[in-house]
């Protein structure tokens, strides 16, 4: 009888530890998967906006697009989270990485961003993306950046990067963690 109880105890213990590891894995992987999905849609957006700049050839239209989108009344209930504003920004550089337009921080215009990974790699014809913190001590202050090349006559003449604060996505992650 004693052997049966000990065996049963170890079976329950092993199953409990396995279940705990599974839940722990799912919870840890959830944020990573959510950020991957966000990055994927940012790649699309960056390329659409880069194509727009190639087609239109002016910054005025790009500025107007962002101004209009920031002034829209948004009430989108997405998985129990209410979205009320556009959380995506973009900047455009020339072929040297100098900022020509920044929808979120116009004071950056004229700054050299060529050292940043999203710009440097995109201008070199590769996939350029990065994540940077606005406050090194706060892991929730990360901002995701994804670049797309702007072409003219077959040459890369600039980079259009879209950027989004990870804090915009974290409420979805937290809600899913509660659900799990």
Where do the model's predicted regions map?
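Extreme N-terminal signal-anchor transmembrane helix of membrane signaling/transducer proteins, especially
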Residues: 1-26
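Juxtamembrane membrane-water interface segments immediately C-terminal to a transmembrane helix
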Residues: 14-17, 25-51, 69, 175-179
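Extracellular/periplasmic ligand-binding regions of membrane signal-transduction receptors
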Residues: 36-72, 95-100, 104-105
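Extracytoplasmic/periplasmic sensor domains and loops in membrane signaling proteins
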Residues: 66-72, 98-100, 104-140
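Short N-terminal helix-loop-first-beta-strand/juxtamembrane motif that initiates sensory/input modules
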Residues: 77-99, 127
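Helix-start (N-cap) segments at beta->loop->alpha junctions
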Residues: 136, 151-153, 161-178
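A short beta-strand signature within small-molecule sensing/ligand-binding domains used
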Residues: 139-149
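Glycine-rich acetyl-CoA-binding "A-motif" of GNAT/NAT acetyltransferases
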Residues: 156
